[in-house]
A protein has these predicted regions:
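Soluble FAD-dependent oxygen oxidases
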Residues: 1-166
Length: 166
């Protein structure tokens, strides 16, 4: 799935169900990407991840650091290309695709009734977005713990929690 010189950008999101509107968005967006980039997009991937969430949902959101307690279908978008001139387009394409999926979910259920936690996925998010989506409402509590046990930020990789201020 890789070769020398291949450029990639990855971002993940999640939906509650793979509905026809969601699949149509993905089909249209992939067609848009391949039409723009052409044959150079042949290693692009759209992954659907299904996990059993019953055990995860058996604990409430505040019981652990991670806030995601919902039933989700993970979607990882990994466009590929080789020409640097497509870098900006690819990044914008990924973000607009994630936004379109979120919009479709809101149209399907504007109240998001029954949604527990966030749909963020730490391995495919950027910076502070990653931290706040992964920890959600637990982030302020984790900042206090960080202040007490690691104020010097010795452990600052992966999900860098900023210690609470005085």
């Amino acid at each position: 799935m890789t070769e020398h010189g291949l450029r990639r950008y990855m971002k993940s999101t999640a939906v509650r169900k793979l509905t026809v509107p969601v699949l149509q968005i993905l089909l249209d967006k992939v067609a848009e990407f391949t039409a723009h980039v052409g044959p150079d997009s042949y290693f692009s991937v759209c992954l659907y991840e299904y996990f059993a969430f019953a055990k995860i949902r058996s604990r409430n959101e505040e019981a652990t650091a991670f806030n995601n307690r919902g039933d989700w279908v993970g979607i990882s978008l990994i466009p590929s290309w080789t020409k640097p001139e497509y870098d900006g387009f690819a990044r914008d394409w990924v973000h607009s695709t994630v936004d379109a999926l979120a919009d479709a979910e809101r149209k399907d259920d504007p109240t998001e009734e029954g949604v527990v936690g966030k749909r963020g996925y730490g391995n495919g998010s950027d910076g502070l977005e990653k931290v706040t989506q992964v920890f959600g409402a637990n982030y302020p509590r984790l900042r206090k713990i960080k202040k007490k046990y690691d104020p010097e930020l010795l452990f600052r990789k992966w999900f860098p929690i900023v210690p609470a201020e005085d």
